[in-house]
Amino acid sequence: MRIFGSLVELVILDVDGVILDILGGLHKNLEETAVHFGLSLDVIAQNIADIALGKLRIRGNARDSTHTLWPHLSEAEVTEFVDFFEEVERRSPYGLIPGSLEIISFLRDAGMPMALATNNHMKSLLWRLEAAGIDPSWFAAIVTKDNRYFKPHPQTFDPIFAAVPVPRDRALYVGDLQIDWDTACEAGVSFIAVLSGGVPRRAFLHEGVQADHIMNRLNNLLECMEL
């Protein structure tokens, strides 16, 4: 399969913001958790607005985000917050971004090996996928924050290439955050940015992502594929 004219033998996907519509419920879930702990809600709206304006570079995991929102919290308090937040997420899981399941099914039917690379922990990822009707066995490898190396470490994708031994220049990573771009660059893997995670086009352009490699959402890949 060729994407943008280049031979691709492996597609690696982020999860939140690429497959799952985290924007559809993140604000609500954060607010519910903040209310439980008596924390300010104003910083949540400001944080999301800053991301949408491209002012904030986020790392894509709950612990770092909690530190950013409420820097006065101790490590123990952050742990409490994250644990409760994950309970809230599990009660109110994120839905699929329109077209994401269809493109995954298309790639599977075409025989394209796929992998996941996310900064979720595995236990969180598994119930996220289950709630969305996605079988983890569809993916040849999965990298989470439980791995020795995770985004943006240069060796993040090593377990994926151990499972699917293709040249790195024939792999493609699709992500929704600047940290995903960093990871792809460090690993020597081609990158496509999607805007469905809330980071604006101009932020990716500022990072150096090619304009035609920035898409609204994952299923736009169909428009640049050649079988």
Predicted feature locations:
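Asp-based, Mg2+/Mn2+-dependent phosphohydrolase catalytic module
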Residues: 1-11, 105, 121-227
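N-terminal helical cap/lid subdomain that shapes the substrate entry/recognition surface
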Residues: 2-110
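Conserved phosphate-coupling serine/threonine residues in phosphotransfer and NTP-handling enzymes
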Residues: 18, 118-120
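Residue-level marker of regulatory loop/turn positions in helix-turn-helix DNA-binding domains and
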Residues: 96, 117, 149
